[in-house]
Amino acid sequence: MSPKRDGLGTGDGLHSQVLQEQVSTGDNLHECDSQGPSKHTLVREGKTYKCKECGSVFNKNSLLVRHQQIHTGVKPYECQECGKAFPEKVDFVRHVRIHTGEKPCKCVECGKVFNRRSHLLCHHQIHTGEKPYECSECGRTFSYHSVFIQHRMTHTGEKLFGCKECGKSFYYNSSLTRHMKIHTREKPYKCSECGKTFTYHSVFFRHSMTHTAGKPYECKECGKGFYYSYSLTRHTRSHTGEKPYECLEHRKAFGYHSAFAQQSKIHSGGKNL
């Protein structure tokens, strides 16, 4: 899997070179309007380059030129597995891990691996006990931003991300992105055993178990097996009695989010949270 090499083309490359030479003269402010295919506008302010389209600031001209691909629609990095293209190399590399299964980010505390550094940093809060996200409504704190957002919606019932195709709305942008695959018919997950493709990773993972006939997560108390670690965690509460979801109206606690959500729905007058 490798990026396309045609990139911005010779016209933009020459323009970038000229811009760098002009900036090196020491001008504090440099504006450049290109009439080429990219139609970009670059601004040099002090030691930074600012994009006139969105206001993003960069310390290198090369970074700004690369950023401009977002606005021009240029996507030089193409996945050879599924044909999906990306304007940024970092997004391309991250996408490729879907096909390769690579998870280069490892937790030094427990050995769990992740395909993104941001996921590792988020996971590490489990070990540190850090809860940086505080609800302004009730004061409850959370380790994960996603959980914090989900909790906040129990107060507002707001779903910010709407699908332009069917009108369905979601709490998270990631949920909307996942949903959009229904309309685009994208199936980025391919089984290496039989070649079957899937829209969602969860379905792909369950399918892969039909080849291995395994449920890797087993309860030490009763021996029941699960496909996912979070399913085992949820099941374990039936043995430990842990109830992490608390209704602030009645100070009632729940072991499962579904039960907590049902209780919250009662308080909200029957609205879906």
Curated annotation (Swiss-Prot):
Signal peptide: none
Zn-finger region bounds: C2H2-type: 49-71, 77-99, 103-127, 133-155, 161-183, 189-211, 217-239
Pfam families the record matches: zf-C2H2
Transmembrane segments: none
Chief location bin: nucleus
Cell compartment(s), UniProt: Nucleus
Coiled-coil parts of chain: none
InterPro entries from the UniProt entry: C2H2-ZF_Transcription_Reg, Znf_C2H2_sf, Znf_C2H2_type
Keyword Nucleus: yes
GO function term, MF aspect, one: RNA polymerase II transcription regulatory region sequence-specific DNA binding
Annotated GO CC locations: nucleus
Physiological role: May be involved in transcriptional regulation.
Name of the protein in its database record: Zinc finger protein 80
Gene that this sequence comes from: ZNF80
